[in-house]
Structures are given as structure tokens and as C-alpha cells.
Amino acid sequence: MQFDYIIIGAGSAGNVLATRLTEDPNTTVLLLEAGGPDYRFDFRTQMPAALAFPLQGKRYNWAYETEPEPFMNNRRMECGRGKGLGGSSLINGMCYIRGNALDLDNWAQEPGLENWSYLDCLPYYRKAETRDVGENDYHGGDGPVSVTTSKPGVNPLFEAMIEAGVQAGYPRTDDLNGYQQEGFGPMDRTVTPHGRRASTARGYLDQAKSRSNLTIRTHAMTDHIIFDGKRAVGVEWLEGDSTIPTRAAANKEVLLCAGAIASPQILQRSGVGNAGLLAEFDIPLVHELPGVGENLQDHLEMYLQYECKEPVSLYPALQWWNQPKIGAEWLFGGTGIGASNHFEAGGFIRSREEFAWPNIQYHFLPVAINYNGSNAVKEHGFQCHVGSMRSPSRGHVRIKSRAPHQHPAILFNYMSHEQDWQEFRDAIRITREIMHQPALDQYHGREISPGVECQTDEQLDEFVRNHAETAFHPCGTCKMGYDEMSVVDGEGRVHGLEGLRVVDASIMPQIITGNLNATTIMIGEKMADMIRGKDALPRSTAGYYVANGMPVRAKKMSRDVN
């Protein structure tokens, strides 16, 4: 089998490339996905409110675990990644957050990455998006990804939480993806007008999969990339339960889009990476790149949970006798509780003046429950998910064997810097202050978790060690740049090799301020033009907010938070 391009991984970036490259009917593409189809009849992946279900099994989740995390009481922590057409966009929380403009401007300060500034990238965010309330300078109106904006009146807790943030002295913003990210406001989400999850399989592949020049293979586990000298010329994979490898040749390029965990694994198995690591497993060295699998980053977060004094939370939706009605409303009308991910309010703030742009993110949820659906509080409640955005901690992904089905050694080194601890202490204390603002007086009861007895630095630190969780945002393991630890250049081409690019969240030099899916899709759109040799979309002229020394908040609070 021969194709112009072979794409490894049908996720948030791979599906973008498959769709854009096959717009030319003379270009042939093979798309390999280790998982299965995105079954449209399976409510677990298609109903937004069911977002916890895919994380509970292994049909749609690789369900990786970390090595014991040394600064987290040696816990082995979850590292869920999407498996199936859509990748992690098939199982994520559907929050459509692009990050802060200064994240991208920060990338663009690196020599050779100048065209990754916010204004260079904004046209590609817009190209990917159809926003339900219409296009403007920041949002698209005819892209493949459906974006739904929170509307007033859905749940009084959303508006109360935003108002409480404003009463605490932080800005209000009407669009976390628009002119000003900093502040509290409604959150966009990747949900269709009919209340279905808007994964990249639905948005992109649905328009491309009928093309004769696109071949899609599911249950195709990539073993390794085939090289002729320093040039990538094909891919070898295993289909289903078969132990007999299948091969295909790439006439132009191999495009690795397997994500921040699997992409470095595949490179290492293919002979690209740290020479010492490859020698441990007798893998012939194709090219030494010590940065492969290094620079691993993530967002860590925790929940602050509160009793809700008014019966307005989603607690009744957790009762089995209410779920048939919720399911029917969603299935037949695309409406009701089932049609939302319920992350409809959030915010970004600076915890201290030293940060030039927000370093803390909030997701508000009108129920008290773990992200994966476990440990639901058996009463009306609500919670804040809060965590730091740009931790200096760095980890790694390293193969444990040559076998493609063997999970790698993953270590994030969460909380390995003093800055991490300071940010989380600040985050807990600020959240408590916000929760005690007048807007929430009629709703908030006792603090369920961590509990008012948890006050000192030592007590807060122990709570974080025992209870903080991943936000499922790994990135950075095939870093874009030109220093000695970078893996790809500014066009995704792997240093020292030909015919091979990496296009996914692994190329982010530094993690962004927010959820990763929207930016991973943008990377796919921008790289698609580079791969095709097309001129980049014209640079945006839209303005964007820079704090530039403005106070973190307008006033200090004097209310007793205990």
C-alpha cells in the first residue's frame, strides 16, 4: 500500500490534517487509529452530561497511570487519553478554551517560532470554529467545530459564581476566548446545536470520510515508523488482535499525531530519541534527539466543594429514577440537562502581581462530584475546580519495552517546585474568599472539602498531596523550537530527519493557560497549510487585553471566610 501521507492518530489534530489534506482529490491519505469508531449510538461519548463515563472504562480511554509521583505522597495518578476516532476530543470535558493571547506570544519569542504569535494563530482558531452566537473578530462562523456559548438562566449557580468573582474584585469578561481572558464569565463548549459532543470525528471526519482519497483504519496500533536512512518512508502497525504487522509506504510524509503520551513512545520505538534509553531495549538508533519524551507538562487541579442550601444543584440528576427522562429529552430533542457538560461558568485570574497573565483557572460545576463520576456527595452541592496554569515542574514519557501495547513510564513530577505550592495555597484561599461573597450567600452552606479545619500552609499542602488530580492536559513531550531539547521545528518537522512531522499537543513548548483541545485543533489547521505549502492566513488585527501592571483585583476583601 502506498499513500502520499500517513497520519498516525485520529485525534484533535490528526483528523484536522486528514480532512484538510484530502481536500485535494489528487492527494491520498491513510489515517491510522489505534482505537475504534466513535459509535454515535453510545451515549457515553455523545451525551455531554455523560462526560465522566468514558473515563471509567478502557473502550475509549487508554487509562494510563503515572509512576509514583514523589511530591504527591507517591500516588500513582490517572492519565486518561482518548482512544477512538476523535482521540481525546471524544472523551474530554468539552470546554472550549483557547488559552491566553500571551501564551502564544510567549512561544513566538523563541527564535524561529515568530509566526506562532497570537495574531498569527487567531485566524486558524476562527477557521476551525462555528460559534452558535455568530462570528466576530475572535470567533468563526463556518468552521467544522461547533461551539456553544452558555446562555443566561440555565442555572442560577452559574451567574452567582461569576458575580461572586466580580464582587471579590476580579474582572468580569463576557468572552473567555475573546478580547480579554482574564476574569470570570461564561464558558464556551464543544457541543453541537443538537446537544451532541462536537469531537473532531464529528466536525472534521464526517465531511471527509466518504472521500475516495482518504483511507481510515481503526484498531490499528502503530508499532514503528519505517526509515530509509534519515528519511521516514512508511509505517508498520498491528491490526486488531493480529500479531502479523501491516505496512504502508508514505510517498511524501509521515505525520505523527498520537498525542503527548503516544507520540514520543512511537518515536522512541522507531529509533528516535535518547540514545541511552533506546540502547536499553536494543532499538537501533536512527537519530539521537534527547528531548523526545522530556518536557512533559500538565495542569493539576483540585475541587473545593460546598453544600448548596437551595435545591438548585444537579444532585437530582444523579438519582437513577430521574435519568430516563433526562436521557429521553437529550436523545429525542437534544435538550435538557443531558445536552450540557455543565462547565458553563469559569474564570482566569492572577494570584499575585508577579504574573503578567492569569496563572489560575476556575471551572464551576453545579454538583459536588469527582471528574470521573466517583465520590458524588449525596446532597445538593456545588464545587470549584481550581488549579495553576503554568507550573515549572517538568516530567517525562519513556518506553518500558519495544512492545507497542506496553504502556510507557509516565512521570509528571507534579508539585516539584516551591512556586507550585504557593500557587495552590493562594488558589484555595482565594476560592474561599470568592465563595463567601454576597452573590453566593443564599446558596453556600458548609465547606465539604477540604473543610474549614484545613487552614495552615501545612494542612493545605497535605490536602493537595492527597487530593489534587490531573486536568488531563498533558503536552510538551516533542517540543517545538531550536534549542538542544527541542524535537521539531516551527513547521513540525522532526530535527535531523526528513519526511516526518509531529502535529499535536506534544509540540507545545510551554503549556497554555487553559484547556488544550481548541489549541491542538488550531495547531492542526495551521500545520495543514504548512504541509500543503499554502500561504498562511492573513495575520489578525484584533486587539487583546494585556494587564501591563494593572492590579490583580480591584479591592481586598474584609469578609470572614471561616
Curated annotation (Swiss-Prot):
Cross-referenced Gene3D superfamilies: FAD/NAD(P)-binding domain (3.50.50.60), Glucose Oxidase, domain 3 (3.30.560.10)
GO biological process: glycine betaine biosynthetic process from choline
Positions of FAD binding: 4-33
Keywords, in A-Z order: FAD, Flavoprotein, NAD, Oxidoreductase
Enzyme Commission number(s) from the entry: 1.1.99.1, 1.2.1.8
Oxidoreductase listed as a keyword: yes
Cofactor: FAD
Cystine pairings recorded for this chain: none
Pathway the protein takes part in: Amine and polyamine biosynthesis; betaine biosynthesis via choline pathway; betaine aldehyde from choline (cytochrome c reductase route): step 1/1
One Pfam entry name: GMC_oxred_C
Active site: H473
A GO MF label: choline dehydrogenase activity
Keyword Coiled coil among UniProt keywords: no
InterPro entries: BetA, FAD/NAD-bd_sf, GMC_OxRdtase, GMC_OxRdtase_N, GMC_OxRtase_C
Family per record: Belongs to the GMC oxidoreductase family.
HAMAP family: Choline_dehydrogen
Protein name: Oxygen-dependent choline dehydrogenase
Native source organism of the sequence: Escherichia coli (strain SMS-3-5 / SECEC)
Organism lineage string: Bacteria, Pseudomonadati, Pseudomonadota, Gammaproteobacteria, Enterobacterales
